[in-house]
Amino acid sequence: MRDKIRLNSSAGTGHFYTTTKNKRNMPGKFEIKKFDPVARKHVMYKEGKIK
């Protein structure tokens, strides 16, 4: 089952992306480098909970 997750910017801008992940294949915290339009550069995004 794919669960919805929120990717929070590590730049502290408050920007986030939403996506899904398969917890069976990826049990750990998800991290990916994506573009932050507020900071206008690529930064690390880390997994957080959707409230």
From Swiss-Prot:
Keywords: Ribonucleoprotein, Ribosomal protein. Residues 1-23 are annotated as: Disordered. InterPro entries: Ribosomal_bL33, Ribosomal_bL33_CS, Ribosomal_bL33_sf, Ribosomal_zn-bd. Disulfide bonds: none annotated. The keyword Magnesium does not apply. GO terms for molecular function: structural constituent of ribosome. Residues 7-20 have a biased composition (Polar residues). GO terms for cellular component: cytosolic large ribosomal subunit. Signal peptide: none annotated. GO terms for biological process: translation. Pfam families: Ribosomal_L33 (PF00471). Belongs to the bacterial ribosomal protein bL33 family. This is Large ribosomal subunit protein bL33. The gene is rpmG.
